[in-house]
Swiss-Prot record, chain B:
It catalyses: a quinone + NADH + 5 H(+)(in) = a quinol + NAD(+) + 4 H(+)(out). Pfam families: Proton_antipo_M (PF00361). It comes from Thermobifida fusca (strain YX). It is a multi-pass membrane protein. The keyword Transport applies. GO terms for cellular component: plasma membrane. This is NADH-quinone oxidoreductase subunit N. NDH-1 is composed of 14 different subunits. Subunits NuoA, H, J, K, L, M, N constitute the membrane sector of the complex.
Length: 982, 549
């Protein structure tokens, strides 16, 4: 069986080449492929009907129980013959329908052949996932076929609508299939049918599968796509939308009916929706002018009929359903083909323009009459036999549902008779006020032949109904509850209720035809909303909803993104706290306050933080943020942690200065004012997050099991020869950590500088004082052979300034380069006087760090602040002058000293970082307690100075220089970045 | 250090013995790490014009060697045990980790091909990241043909982080891996050659939000430590079944799970932590986007599976509701938003978000099928997405050579460049989960696992969301094949050998995994040794029997 599929898909792949070579005649060759499938099946039919299905099994993905499993039983056989037989005829028809120069014909031929293959696979598949696979393949192929005229907007739309509706249904069905397979423990359809699982999950699965089936078979509420799909070339309509693809849904229902036909949800859904579709679409068909649309609505109506029949779920219904399915394929396909012939020959298919074709195309006319009689359910056609059986099945089912459904399908059949007559009259008969339609070119024999064959089969089917009965019964008997009086297909059942109903339908149909104008008017007057419009509106609303959601959530605003994350975090973290009553845990008691003065910095912090949210100036905001830092430092101090406080103070100061240096180049105010409401929301989120983190930090204490490590710190500090625990921790107990941290600091310094100095920094800017003038000469960077450009910062040569008062000593020599209005004598004097003091303090902090407040880090920052003061007072050249060592050297030196100390411990002592201590006694001073840790701390000290110098060089002097250059070249300082504040 | 002779009770003993490392088992990590370090040294000492060839060769050889070593190790794993733990049980070598590492290395190699691609000496990266966008200086650099070959060592470090992320066996190692992975990526995101401000903004956003999520991750670790008294996965797992260290401490675990979850879900990019994804994917240089969309996603899910299956494997009931909500939100919101996208990279970003939601359904399943399903899905998605981004790099604006992101420009591409459009069409079909592509098997695998675990509603949502996403994938295919070529039709570059290989790899993987998934499922993806699906409990042990602890 796998070879059938391989043959089809190979033929599909070859089709474009064949069409290129032979033109439309290639369809003859392609028609052989489905024909051979039908021929393959015929000899196997007796065995299959006798109850010995053909099987094929090949594992595909055994881990997921996926397999290439095929099985041909009676139902599959019938479907295969329909799909392959009609497929072959349609391909023949194509050979005359198209012309050689039809654009995209090669692709069309390939896709159509491929579709036939997919359809054959679909009806043979014995694995749920295989079934789904072919199901989706038919969807995709049908999409390509409907969209055959890509240049037509309607064609594209119809194709998109069809694929959207059926894919959605298909995917829903996939869920159902997976649930079904999981509940049954196997994905083999035969296995599931043999031992049907049950339970709520299975019911859900069946409803989901039904959604897929109904969408494929265009049952209400999914009927909209089929009429729209009539944009496709007529052979496609005849094959996909009458004989094959739309039957897939009905096939699936038929396939599962033997196992699940008695489940109420399944029954009610199928019967009610099926009947409703039959009536609704039949009514719509009655007012169509386009013959093809008339047939399309008629097809939807008939599909509803089929669904309703199978939905009844009895053995007789299954028999009638399968018979009706065959009859429908045999009459609807030729009718579509006839429409194609008419369209082709006259150039129109609008029944208001057609007239008098009965005499001009007699063969076509009689073919249509036969097919229409079958459609209307008139004897002696196949349609009659099938419909009689169907009425009988409804009658015998003997439930309220079936009885109501019977009434419904009688109304539907009545409409069917009506629109059959409308078709016949509209296509062929003479009409008043309409001149006979001229034939552009009469249809050739080969063009008409497929329709004749199919119509003839409709006729034969009627007479041979009793011959076909065993085939259909072979399937129908698999439905349980046959009873002792199973129905049989026959042309003549005797005078019974079905026959009576047929007469009623005929009479009603004639009346409808008689009053066709009024019916059309009534239909149009009281039409339900056009399904297509509903679909378009849904799509429109979906996309506008999506746009709104996108606009709301995806506006590119960082605060908004962060807010979303924080809110989610608040929700997911608060829930367990509240739910688990975490506050009932055994946590240490809260100490709200130690001394009243703590309230002052606390209040300052809160006010400053809130104020920060309101201000518009950047600088002010930075100052306010700094105040929260100073407040925290004060709290540290009040809490008895002078080291922390000192470090915090110093760090705050440095950051404040750095901020100010950077803000010089930014607009003074935040660029966009923030909405008050947004600020309030942000405020709430901020407060919420803060409280959450605080609460969690506090509650975590409840989880403490081990003794705190800090219990041992005093002893450790003693051991290390110091009395300042913080300092000892930094430079001794955890010196490895400090090593890591200062390495990071060094890397950060390099990073900050490299952002401004694009090029590798070559040498220290060379500033020195010669007699009478300051020479500030910046070295030329090494010339780069590749480019001729000059990088901005460090190339400017010059700044040779002759001072006005050369012989007077200056407080700060660097100020000579400053403009007069920028100078401040007082500041210069203070800076000059303070500098040695500051350096002295820094050294003091460094030396005493081990036993008192201070340390290398704090000392380094203090020294850095000294540099900072000189820079602020004297400008960048003063900075260059005040410390002649380049920052890179200092940083490297600092790192070397610390590493050296560490290694020295290994060389002279016992291990890395091993150390010693001794007291140095100097005159006039307290004995200085020297330890090897001091050397380590000195490294930190040097490194921190280098870091601050680096920041000043880059963010201070570097930016100054750019600004100077800009002002020289007359360029106004431009703001390079816009801050996102919203 | 001055020896501390304190009593044992007050200070925990610090080991004095160096750990005994099995360098052979660590070799895939070490090779990539070494390549990164050597790359840095190359930057410092090799003349600029020779760096490109050395760096590309170094990076590709390293990734290739690491890949081979990973494969060899799979073969060398003892058949009867799940795997081994190394270096004080901080790193684990088991079948899932080796699988994820192998996939990551393969995807990294594919991305490296894109990264290394140069056209007329132009790579996807800016010549000089520090030059102000639009400045004279930038122009000078462009004219001089400057290039950042630092990209390669950065990528190596990122890949190292990804490898380690899937192999970490305790939360702290995992955190370090997270940072090693993320930091280079933050930087790489800001290096786009064109639309640089955009790229820098993306990098900044990614960095800030990523920093926050890392912080949450750390907070979560602290909470879990408070609950379990340990950060090792095995210990956390044991604590989960014994009820933790303290009475009533379960909320600590819950907060821990939530916060660790937030950290990981951010990396994975699920709603509501997805916001960064479209902006970053769009702004970053496309080869880096490809690396992030494939490698990072695989790594993040690899880690997530390990955390939730092993560490939190005994507390499934506690975290399942959260992941349910996140999965549903992700699949619905991202699918809805994706419909409106007009830019190919943003669309792929949202598609990545939706796919993350699909994979989450497998995590929620918490059974062996979920694990193998997620593995297959990740591998399939990774290759497809790398291929898709490779194609994005080829379609350029005619005037300035930037990538033509606007989808309207892609109209009619099927006529002008049929192979390219067909490849993208295939990738899109795979994203949509159409049968015979890898995407279908992947979706089937995760959905099947979720149904088996009783998460049917999740699967229903997932499938509906697939339908919505299929809508926009199909729309692009329609646009490419059925619409008239656009006025401002893009210039389609002829794929060079590097990009061509990546596209080819994507197509081959998508088709192979779609048509012949059997061999892959059987031989490549680790399977639990004995599937005992008798009881739910038994299933749980089967689920994590794959993981070494």
């Amino acid at each position: 069986m796998i070879w059938l599929l391989v043959a089809h898909f190979t033929a599909a792949a070859l089709a474009p080449a064949l069409v290129r070579k032979w033109g439309r005649q290639a369809f003859f060759a392609l028609a052989l492929v489905p024909a051979s499938a039908a021929i393959w099946a015929l000899p196997r039919a007796p065995g299959v009907i006798a109850g010995e299905p053909e099987l094929f099994f090949l594992p595909w993905a055994p881990n997921y129980q996926l397999a290439l499993a095929f099985r041909m039983d009676a139902l599959s056989l019938v479907m295969l013959l329909l799909a392959a037989g009609i497929g072959a005829l349609i391909l023949l028809y194509c050979a005359r329908y198209f012309s050689d120069d039809e654009p995209g014909l090669g692709r069309f031929a390939g896709v159509l052949t491929g579709f036939a293959g997919a359809m054959i696979g679909l009806v043979l598949a014995n694995d749920l996932i295989q079934l789904y696979l072919y199901w989706e393949l038919t969807t995709v192929f049908s999409y390509l076929l409907i969209g055959h005229y890509p240049e037509r907007r309607d064609s594209r739309r119809a194709a998109a609508m069809a694929i959207n509706v059926t894919t959605m249904g298909g995917l829903t069905m996939l869920v159902g299939l997976v649930i079904l397979g999981e509940s049954a423990g196997t994905y083999l359809i035969s296995g599931i049918l043999a031992e049907p699982p049950s339970g709520t999950a299975v019911t859900v699965a069946l409803v989901l599968i039904l959604v897929g089936a109904l969408s494929k078979s265009a049952i209400f509420p999914f009927s909209l796509w089929l009429p729209a799909a009539m944009q496709a070339p007529t052979p496609v309509s005849a094959y996909l939308h009458a004989a094959a693809m739309v039957k897939a849904g009905v096939y699936l229902i038929a396939r599962l009916t033997p196992a699940f036909g008695d489940i109420p949800a399944w029954q009610y859904t199928a019967v009610i929706l099926g009947t409703a579709t039959m009536i609704g679409s039949g009514w719509r068909a009655l007012r169509q002018h386009d013959l093809k649309l008339l047939l399309a609505h008629g097809t939807v109506s008939q599909l509803g009929f089929l669904t309703a029949i199978f939905g009844i779920g009895t053995r007789d219904a299954a028999l009638a359903g399968l018979a009706m399915l065959c009859a429908h394929a045999l009459f609807k396909a030729p009718l579509f083909l006839v429409v194609g012939i008419i369209d082709h020959s006259t150039g129109t298919r609008d029944l208001r323009e057609l007239s008098g074709l009965r005499k001009k195309m007699p063969v076509v006319f009689w073919t249509s009459v036969v097919a229409l009689m079958s459609m209307a359910g008139l004897p002696p056609m196949a349609g009659f036999a099938a419909k009689e059986a169907a009425f009988g099945a409804f009658e015998h089912a003997d439930t309220l549902l079936a009885t109501l459904a019977l009434a419904g399908v009688v109304v539907g059949t009545l409409f069917t008779v009506g629109y059959s007559l409308r078709f016949l009259w509209g296509a062929f008969f003479d009409k008043e006020n309409t001149s006979p339609t001229p034939l552009l070119h009469p249809p050739g024999p080969l063009f008409v032949a497929p329709a004749i064959v199919l119509a003839a089969l409709s006729l034969l089917g009627g007479f041979g109904a009793s011959l076909a009965d065993p085939v259909f019964a072979s399937y129908a008997d698999t439905v349980p509850g046959a009873g002792h009086d199973p129905a049989h297909l026959a042309l003549w059942h005797g005078l019974s209720l079905p026959l009576l109903l047929t007469a009623l339908c005929l009479a009603g149909g004639l009346l409808l035809f008689r009053w066709r104008v009024m019916v059309a008017w009534l239909g149009a007057r009281f039409a339900l909303p056009e399904a297509g419009n509903v679909y378009r509106r849904i799509v429109y609303y979906l996309s506008s909803f999506a746009t709104q959601v996108t606009g709301l959530t995806q506006r590119g605003s960082l605060p908004l993104y962060l807010g979303t994350i924080l809110v989610s975090l608040l929700v997911v973290s608060t829930a367990p706290i509240v739910w688990g009553r975490l506050w009932t845990l055994d946590v240490p008691p809260v100490r709200w306050i130690d001394t009243p003065p703590q309230l002052i910095p606390a209040a300052i912090i809160i006010i400053a933080a809130l104020w920060t949210l309101i201000v518009r100036g950047r600088l002010f905001a930075v100052v306010l943020v700094g105040m929260t830092g100073y407040g925290t430092a004060t709290l540290f101090a009040l809490h008895g942690a002078p080291d922390l406080a000192l470090t915090q103070f110093l760090v705050e100061t440095v950051s404040l200065v750095v901020f100010v240096l950077v803000l010089r180049r930014l607009p003074p105010q935040f660029s966009t004012p923030v909405l008050r409401s947004r600020r309030l929301v942000n405020l709430a989120i901020g407060i919420g997050s803060g409280i959450l983190v605080a609460v969690m930090a506090y509650l975590t204490l409840a989880g403490r099991q081990a003794e705190s490590i800090s219990e041992g710190f005093p002893a450790a500090a003693e051991e290390a020869g110091g009395s300042n625990i913080v300092s000892v921790l930094l430079v001794d107990v955890r010196s490895w950590d400090t090593m890591g941290e200062i390495s990071v600091l060094a890397a950060v310094a390099a990073g900050v500088a490299s952002l401004l100095f694009v090029r590798r920094r070559t040498r220290l800017p060379h500033t020195h004082i010669e007699t009478g003038r300051i020479v500030a000469r910046l070295p030329q960077p090494p010339s780069n052979g590749e480019s001729e450009w000059s990088p901005l910062p460090l190339t400017y040569v010059g700044d040779i300034i002759t001072p006005r008062v050369a012989h007077k000593p200056l407080w700060l020599p660097g100020v000579l380069t400053l403009a007069q209005e920028r100078r401040s004598i007082i500041f210069e004097v203070v800076a000059r006087l303070m500098f040695p003091v500051i350096i002295l303090i820094s050294v003091f902090l460094l030396l005493t760090g081990h036993s008192h407040v201070g340390g290398g880090f704090a000392g380094g920052i203090v020294a850095g602040l000294g540099l900072m003061v000189r820079y602020l007072a004297g400008g960048r050249h003063e900075l260059y002058l005040s410390l002649r060592l380049p920052p890179g050297l200092l940083i490297g030196l600092g790192l070397s000293i610390t590493t050296g100390t560490a290694l020295a411990g290994a060389i002279f002592g016992t291990e890395i970082f091993a150390g010693g201590a001794f007291d140095l006694h100097l005159p006039f001073l307290e004995p200085i307690h020297l330890t090897s840790a001091l050397a380590f701390d000195f490294g930190v000290y040097v490194l921190v100075i280098g870091l601050i110098q680096d920041i000043l060089y880059s963010l201070g002097a570097g930016i100054d220089e750019q600004a100077e250059k800009d002002s020289r070249t007359g360029k106004a300082p431009e703001y390079e970045s816009e801050e996102v504040t919203a | 250090m001055i020896p501390l002779s304190l009593s044992e009770t007050t200070l925990p003993t610090v080991t004095t013995q160096a750990p005994d490392l099995d360098y052979w088992l660590l070799s895939p990590l070490l090779v990539v790490f070494a390549a990164g370090v050597i790359g840095v040294i190359v930057e410092a000492f090799v003349p600029a014009q020779r760096r490109y060839s050395i760096q590309t060769a170094l990076a590709m050889v390293a990734v290739g060697v690491a890949f081979v070593l990973t494969l060899v190790q799979v073969g060398a794993l003892p058949a009867d045990s799940a795997g081994l733990t190394l270096a004080f049980a901080t790193v684990v070598v088991d079948r899932p980790s080796l699988f994820f590492q192998g996939v990551i290395l393969a995807l990294a190699l594919a991305s490296l091909l894109l990264i290394a691609e140069r056209r007329d000496g132009e790579s996807a990266f800016t010549g000089q990241a520090a030059a102000v966008p639009g400045s004279e200086e930038e122009r000078a650099h462009v004219l001089a043909g400057s290039q950042h070959t630092e990209v390669y060592p950065l990528v190596m470090f990122a890949v190292l982080g990804m490898q380690l992320f899937t192999a970490a066996n305790d939360f702290l190692t995992m955190f370090i891996a997270l940072e090693v992975m993320s930091l280079p990526l933050y930087l790489l995101c800001g290096l786009a050659r064109r639309r640089r401000l955009f790229s820098q903004e993306a990098a900044l956003k990614y960095f800030l939000l990523g920093a926050f999520s890392s912080a949450f991750f750390l907070f979560g670790i602290a909470m879990v430590y408070g609950y379990a008294g340990a950060v090792e996965f095995a210990a956390v797992r044991a604590a989960g079944s014994s009820g933790g260290l303290i009475d009533g401490g379960e909320p600590l675990l819950l907060i821990g799970i939530a916060m660790i979850g937030v950290g990981m879900l951010f990396k994975v990019g699920t709603v509501p932590f997805h916001n960064w994804k479209p902006d970053v994917y769009q702004g970053a240089p496309t080869p880096i986007t490809a690396l992030m969309a494939s490698g990072t996603l695989v790594a993040a899910f690899g880690a997530m599976l390990r955390v939730f299956y092993v560490a939190f494997g005994t507390t499934v009931a506690q975290w399942r509701p959260m992941l349910w909500v996140v999965a549903i939100l992700t699949m619905v919101v991202a699918a809805v938003i994706a419909v409106t996208q007009r830019d190919i990279k943003r669309l792929l970003a949202y598609s990545s978000v939706v796919h993350a939601g699909f994979i989450l359904t497998a995590v929620v399943a918490a059974n062996a099928d979920g694990l193998t399903g997620a593995m297959f899905y990740l591998a399939a998605y990774g290759f497809t997405t790398v291929g898709a981004f490779a194609i994005v790099t080829l379609v350029r604006n005619p005037d300035n050579g930037a990538e033509a992101g606007d989808l309207t420009q892609w109209a009619g591409l099927g006529r002008t460049s049929p192979f390219l459009a067909a490849s993208l069409g295939l990738f899109l079909l795979a994203f949509a989960g159409i049968p015979l592509t890898s995407g279908f098997i992947g979706k089937f695998a995760v959905f099947e696992a979720a149904v088996a675990a009783g998460a049917t509603p999740l699967v229903v949502v997932g499938v509906l969301s697939s339908a919505v996403t299929a809508f926009f994938y199909v729309r692009i295919i329609v646009l490419m094949f059925f619409a008239e070529p656009a006025e401002n039709a893009p210039r389609v570059l002829k794929p060079g050998i590097l990009t061509g290989t990546t596209v080819g790899l994507g197509v081959a993987a998508t088709l192979l995994l779609g048509i012949l998934p059997g061999p892959v499922l059987e031989h490549v993806i680790p399977q639990p040794a004995a599937e005992t699906s008798e009881a739910v409990a038994a299933e749980h042990t089967a689920a994590d029997s794959l993981f070494a602890r």
